């Protein structure tokens, strides 16, 4: 198992790629703190089922990531478990409305950046302080091909480009305390974020992909598990595209 004996913190774990991350990481032997925004009985039942199936513990932790006080309280819950934090996956994110550049307001930008970038930075600051105590760790930031290509909404693309830039800076700085930092850039993935797209836009996107289909969330999660594992011990500061051959 890729992650046997490791403890991972995954944000945005209630649905989509984050839910797949919790399942795949548990399958690969990791214990998981599964961060989500609001309490949900079905979410907790799913975590309990996965924990029993794979013989690990998975604990739900609820907080609004953009609320600094709530986030610090969530990390106090993590620290109360007295288990080392080995892996952080910054997965939480939102996409926002589909607007043209000229129609995107500063308010739109702030709302997306607060969740997709600033919260990611604050989570990383808190998590890597814990990792640094053991002089080792791995961070996987979930970016997007939109942050590379700039072909999506302005606010979303800009937020993911910022995640990529931060990944490189974090990698340079944190390697001194044994922490690797990489970004994973998914392409067109079958999640709630893209379910509302029109059939026309969906077909346009699929037409750019050599594999002619959306990614499954578990396919993205599998690559994240590799980057978090010791199998990727010589990989840091990189952006891994997982896009089915998007040209």
Regions found by a protein language model. Give the residues of each.
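C-terminal substrate-recognition "lid" of short-chain dehydrogenase/reductases
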Residues: 2, 136, 213-242
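Alpha-helical segment proximal to the catalytic Tyr-Lys
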Residues: 129, 172-176, 233
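Conserved glycine-rich cofactor-binding loop
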Residues: 7, 14-15
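Active-site helix of classical SDR
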Residues: 124, 159, 167
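Residue(s) in the substrate-gating loop at a strand-loop-helix junction
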Residues: 144
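Conserved glycine-rich Rossmann-like NAD(P)H-binding loop of the short-chain dehydrogenase/reductase
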Residues: 28-44
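Substrate-binding pocket helix/loop in short-chain dehydrogenase/reductase
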Residues: 99-101, 105-110, 194, 205
């Amino acid at each position: 198992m890729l992650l046997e004996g490791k403890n991972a913190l995954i944000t945005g774990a209630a649905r989509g790629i984050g839910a797949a991350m919790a399942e795949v990481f548990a399958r690969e032997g990791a214990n998981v703190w599964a961060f989500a925004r609001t309490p949900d009985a079905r979410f907790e039942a799913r975590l309990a089922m996965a924990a029993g199936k794979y013989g690990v513990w998975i604990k739900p932790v609820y907080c609004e990531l953009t609320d600094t006080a709530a986030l610090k309280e969530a990390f106090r819950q993590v620290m109360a478990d007295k288990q080392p934090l080995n892996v952080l996956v910054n997965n939480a994110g939102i996409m926002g409305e589909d607007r043209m550049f000229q129609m995107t307001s500063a308010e739109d930008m702030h709302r997306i950046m607060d969740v997709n970038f600033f919260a990611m930075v604050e989570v990383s600051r808190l998590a890597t302080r814990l990792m640094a105590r053991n002089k080792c760790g791995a961070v996987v930031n979930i970016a997007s091909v939109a942050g590379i290509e700039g072909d999506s909404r302005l606010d979303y693309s800009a937020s993911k480009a910022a995640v990529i830039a931060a990944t490189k800076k974090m990698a340079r700085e944190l390697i001194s305390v044994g922490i690797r930092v990489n970004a994973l850039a998914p392409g067109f993935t079958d999640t709630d974020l893209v379910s509302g797209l029109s059939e026309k836009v969906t077909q346009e996107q699929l037409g750019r992909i050599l594999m002619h289909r959306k990614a499954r969330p578990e396919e993205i999660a599998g690559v994240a598990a590799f980057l978090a594992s010791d199998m990727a011990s010589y990989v840091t500061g990189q952006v891994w595209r997982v896009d089915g051959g998007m040209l």
